[in-house]
């Protein structure tokens, strides 16, 4: 009697391939498009309320524009104080100015100023800085002597504006000493003049001879 083998159990992969997929649900119904002529509605299908206290919403928009325009450069949103909107958030802060002017009396003289400058009195009329006037002569120094050499005393000379009296204070200059070589110098100059005269006469004769030869050549026919 032959042995009958039992059939193998069904494979799970074969069962999944043989199964049919479940049917898909039907698509949802399409909602109709809202009418554009009706009132404006938001996402919750509620009418958009108008601004309170306005009939058509224009005054409220103007108030918003005014509130936006009131914001200055330093109060603009997204900017830190001290930063300008044109430079962006990463721009460095502006360089601080020199600050208020300091009074030299309060803080003393600066490093470049002489401490004695603050003790000098103000300059009078006709005075120049560094040159005191007639009444402000430094102590311990005599007054400067005038250039005429008479200690400030001007005499009445013969000419207008002359200084120093009649002009007899200064002796006349002494005469020059006699030249011992005057005779030899005159003799040398005389010999040179004679030599130049002879050379000049010789040059004139040469020119006259050349001119005569030239005229004779022109007069003879060729």
Curated annotation (Swiss-Prot):
GO BP annotations, alphabetical order: symbiont-mediated arrest of host cell cycle during G2/M transition
Upper taxonomic lineage: Viruses, Monodnaviria, Shotokuvirae, Cossaviricota, Papovaviricetes
Region (Disordered): 1-184
Purpose of the protein: Contributes to multiple aspects of the viral life cycle including viral genome amplification, suppression of suprabasal cell differentiation and egress of newly formed virions. Induces host cell cycle arrest at the G2 phase by associating with and preventing the nuclear entry of host CDK1/cyclin B1 complexes. Inhibits cellular DNA replication by preventing loading of host replication licensing proteins MCM2 and MCM7 onto chromatin. Within the cytoplasm, associates with host kinase SRPK1, a splicing factor regulator, and inhibits its activity.
Listed name of the protein: Protein E4
UniProt entry keywords in alphabetical sequence: Early protein, Host cytoplasm, Host G2/M cell cycle arrest by virus, Host nucleus, Host-virus interaction, Modulation of host cell cycle by virus, Phosphoprotein
Heme in keyword set: no
Biased composition (Pro residues): 20-32, 90-101, 170-179
Cell compartments where the protein resides: Host cytoplasm; Host nucleus
Modification note: Phosphorylated by host ERK. The phosphorylation triggers a structural change that enhances keratin binding and protein stability.
UniProt keyword Ligase present: no
Biased segments, Basic and acidic residues type: 1-16, 48-73
Any one GO cellular component localisation term in the record: host cell nucleus
Additional facts recorded: The major E4 form is first synthesized as an E1^E4 fusion protein from spliced E1^E4 transcripts, such that the first few amino acids of the E4 protein are derived from the N terminus of E1.
Family, similarity comment: Belongs to the papillomaviridae E4 protein family.
Quaternary structure and partners: Assembles into oligomeric complexes. Interacts with host CDK1. Interacts with host SRPK1; this interaction may favor expression of late viral transcripts. Interacts with host cytokeratin components KRT8 and KRT18.
Biased composition (Low complexity): 76-89
């Amino acid at each position: 009697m032959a042995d009958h083998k039992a059939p193998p159990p069904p494979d799970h992969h074969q069962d999944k391939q043989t199964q049919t997929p479940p049917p898909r649900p039907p698509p949802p119904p399409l909602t109709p498009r809202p009418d554009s002529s009706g009132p404006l509605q938001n996402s919750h299908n509620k009418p958009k309320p108008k601004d309170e206290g306005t009939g058509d919403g224009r005054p409220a928009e103007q108030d918003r524009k005014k509130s936006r325009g009131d914001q200055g450069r330093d109060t603009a949103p997204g900017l830190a104080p001290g930063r300008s909107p044109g430079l962006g958030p990463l721009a460095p802060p502006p360089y601080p100015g020199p600050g208020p002017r300091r009074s030299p009396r309060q803080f003393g003289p600066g490093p470049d100023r002489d401490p004695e400058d603050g003790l000098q009195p103000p300059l009078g009329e006709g005075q120049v800085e560094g040159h005191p006037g007639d009444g402000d002569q430094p102590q311990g120094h005599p007054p400067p002597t005038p250039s005429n050499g008479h200690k400030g005393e001007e005499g009445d000379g013969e000419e207008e504006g002359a200084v120093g009296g009649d002009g007899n204070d200064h002796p006349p200059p002494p005469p020059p000493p006699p030249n011992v070589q005057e005779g030899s110098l005159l003799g040398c100059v005389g010999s040179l003049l004679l030599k130049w005269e002879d050379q000049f006469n010789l040059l004139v004769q040469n020119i006259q001879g050349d001119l005569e030869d030239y005229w004779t050549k022109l007069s003879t026919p060729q």
